[in-house]
Amino acid sequence: MTGRDDISEAKSKGKILAPSVGNEKSGRLHGPAMRSKGFAITDLLGLEAELQPPSISLPNCEGPGVSLGGVSLTNGSLPLGLGFLCGFASQQPPGTTCLLPTHIPFLQPRPDHHYLHTSDKHKENISDDDSILGDKNDLKASSAQSKRKKRRHRTVFTAHQLDELEKSFNEAHYPDVYAREMLALKTELPEDRIQVWFQNRRAKWRKREKCWGRSSVMAEYGLYGAMVRHSIPLPESIINSAKNGLVGSCAPWLLGMHKKSVDITSKVDADDLVTERSRGESQVRDFTNPHSESHRSPRHHSHSMDISEERAIDLSSTAKQENQSSGRHNSIRDSQSDFTDSDH
């Protein structure tokens, strides 16, 4: 049996065959393509293999029968990692068998496009994950920016505004709504800005008092704030302690602030009384002297004109009546004088 017959028989059976020395000589006679030098594990270990591999030619080599180290492949190029086996086969002695990956199931070569396909999928998955993470980060950043409170523009006070605010703060640390509105008209500031300024000024004052160590003043300050907020009157004990003076009282600062507030209210009441008296006097003047227009207010001008007209009408009617009565008296006197003359 020749080497070609062995190759055809091995291809039909699908088994690995190891050629003998005689077959090697006949293969040399037929050409370099029939040279069979194998390096099977069984031959390397010195064992006789029942199944012998055939030699497979490579189509990419020079000529149809050219082999690498005595072994050629027909199914294409060598798979990755088996190049050193071909180099090792050239150093093996003749008669050794060849272990080929095409006939062993666990050494089957995988196509390159499979690796490329899996790598592309992996890259796509990674890019998708990165895009999802990037979108999440963008959403978190946008939500954080929306939740972040925008800082209001800081109000810059002028010297005139600060002077007015300090004056009102020295008068009362807790101004009511009416006082804040009046101060807003003077300083041309919003009422809420004035309220915030007073809050900050009170905090600054408390901090300064704490640094000085005046704890009693801080206690009085807290009591005064509670009194103003809840409309609580000043206790009688504190008022009675101020009979000998503010210095000997138990709460001098609180009594001083109370005195200021009382003075302000009394001043307002006095102003109201003065205005009421002036109004009463002007009305009396209008009734007594209807022709005088110097003391008339523009608010009651029309009313005073009506009153003066009515009084003028009344005066004219009374004058007529007086004239009539005087004429009657004169006529009676004349008649009496005539009667006396006739008697004589």
From Swiss-Prot:
A motif (Nuclear localization signal) lies at residues 146-150. InterPro entries: CVC (IPR023339), HD (IPR001356), Homeobox_CS (IPR017970), Homeodomain-like_sf (IPR009057), VSX_homeobox_regulators (IPR052294). The keyword Transcription applies. Initially transcribed but not translated in early neural (stage 15) retinal progenitors. Translation occurs during late retinogenesis and requires cell cycle progression with the timing of translation paralleling that of the generation of bipolar cells. Also expressed in the ciliary marginal zone (CMZ) with translation beginning in early postmitotic cells. Also transcribed in early neurulae in the presumptive spinal cord, with expression expanding anteriorly to the midbrain-hindbrain boundary during the tail bud stage. GO terms for biological process: regulation of transcription by RNA polymerase II; retinal bipolar neuron differentiation. Residues 150-209 bind DNA. GO terms for cellular component: nucleus. Keywords: Developmental protein, Differentiation, DNA-binding, Homeobox, Nucleus, Transcription, Transcription regulation. Residues 39-46 are annotated as: Octapeptide motif. Residues 1-12, 111-126, 273-284, 303-313, 331-344 have a biased composition (Basic and acidic residues). Its main location: nucleus. This is Visual system homeobox 1. It comes from Xenopus laevis (African clawed frog). The lineage of its organism: Eukaryota, Metazoa, Chordata, Craniata, Vertebrata. The gene is vsx1.
